[in-house]
A protein has these predicted regions:
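Non-catalytic C-terminal accessory region of glycerolipid acyltransferases
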Residues: 4, 109, 138-277
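A generic structural signal for alpha->beta connector loops
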Residues: 69-71, 107, 128, 151, ...
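Short gly/ser/thr-rich secondary-structure transition/capping motifs
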Residues: 67-74, 134-138, 199-202
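A generic structural signal for well-ordered alpha-helical segments
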Residues: 64-65, 126, 147, 180
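Catalytic core of membrane glycerolipid acyltransferases/transacylases, capturing the structured
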Residues: 34-55, 66-67, 82-136
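Membrane-anchoring hydrophobic helices of lipid-metabolizing enzymes
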Residues: 1-86
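Generic alpha-helical secondary structure signal
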Residues: 29, 59, 120-124, 210, ...
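Short Gly/charged-rich anion-binding patches and loops
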Residues: 59-60, 96, 121, 142-143, ...
């Protein structure tokens, strides 16, 4: 009986959280977004909006922990606060990944699906925060580089959608690599795990696990894109002994492959993925 009551409470609390999230998003889009555009200074307006989002998600994560829906274990959170503008590259096991990362990163911008620009709960948020749409690959890189130059960390899930299975990732797209190369900024790999699985691609919001789910976040050491490309490239260089820089396309492809392999390997090393499954 106690277990059933606990399950029912967590189901109710989860539903309440989604309602609060949706209502607050709608109110933000309808009220705060129009008012924000009255603010004359664009840079300070964006800073104000992203700060509000950061603290709202911090409160939401704290609420989910307080009501017993989730637990959160973070290693290396200081890097998200203190590294300066970087490209955060993370795997994407659950719907809450972006909520957690925005709660941990004070000055952050996201690459988000173009569909959110028409979503009544999100259209105002993504515009006021000047998040970057994935609709146009070229503009995605240009806009992300501008955000980094303005002092924001870019949060990117290169799988493009939530992971297909607990022990498997989608292939990484190259957008994050082009951004890191254009902005000449480090990549900060982040590992995310959710146990038991919750809010995956295959689950509905009401598919509450049998116990509180635990999200683990491990922030790895930053990776210098140019150094990684040089390391991954051919050591021989050109016939005359010089080392020619690879084309942007080849550099992005090399960087994407290396970071994807790095994150996959670390997911096994840290026990987020289980060998043999």
């Amino acid at each position: 009986m106690k277990a059933r009551l606990n399950y029912g409470w967590r189901l109710l609390a989860t539903g309440m959280s989604f309602v609060v999230f949706g209502v607050c998003g709608l109110l933000f889009s309808v009220l705060v977004f129009p008012l924000a555009w009255l603010w004359p200074h664009r840079a300070s307006r964006q800073r104000m909006v992203t700060t509000i989002i950061h603290w709202f998600f911090r409160a939401l994560v704290a609420f989910l922990q307080w009501v017993g829906v989730m637990e959160l274990d973070v290693a290396g959170a200081a890097a998200l606060r203190d590294s300066g503008p970087v490209v955060v590259v993370a795997n994407h096991p659950t719907y809450l990944d972006v909520v957690v990362l925005l709660a941990l990163t004070p000055s952050a911008c996201c690459v988000v699906k173009n569909a959110h620009w028409g979503n009544p709960c999100f259209w105002g948020i993504v515009r006021a925060a000047e998040y970057v749409s994935n609709a146009d690959p070229v503009e995605l890189v240009e806009a992300s580089a501008r955000q980094i130059a303005a002092g924001y960390t870019m949060i990117i899930f290169p799988e493009g959608t939530r992971s297909p299975a607990p022990n498997r990732l989608h292939a990484f797209s190259r957008g994050f690599a082009h951004i890191a190369l254009k902005a000449a900024t480090p990549i900060l790999p982040v590992l995310i795990d959710c146990d038991p699985p919750a809010f995956t691609k295959q689950m509905r919001w009401y598919d509450v696990p049998s116990r509180a789910f635990r999200i683990r976040v491990s922030v790895l050491e930053p990776v210098a894109a140019d150094q990684l490309i040089a390391h991954e490239g051919s050591p021989e260089g050109s016939p005359d002994g010089s080392h020619e820089s690879p084309s942007p396309a080849l550099a992005a492809r090399t960087l994407t492959s290396a970071i994807e392999a790095h994150i996959n390997q670390r997911l096994f090393d840290y026990g987020f993925f289980e060998t043999g499954n």
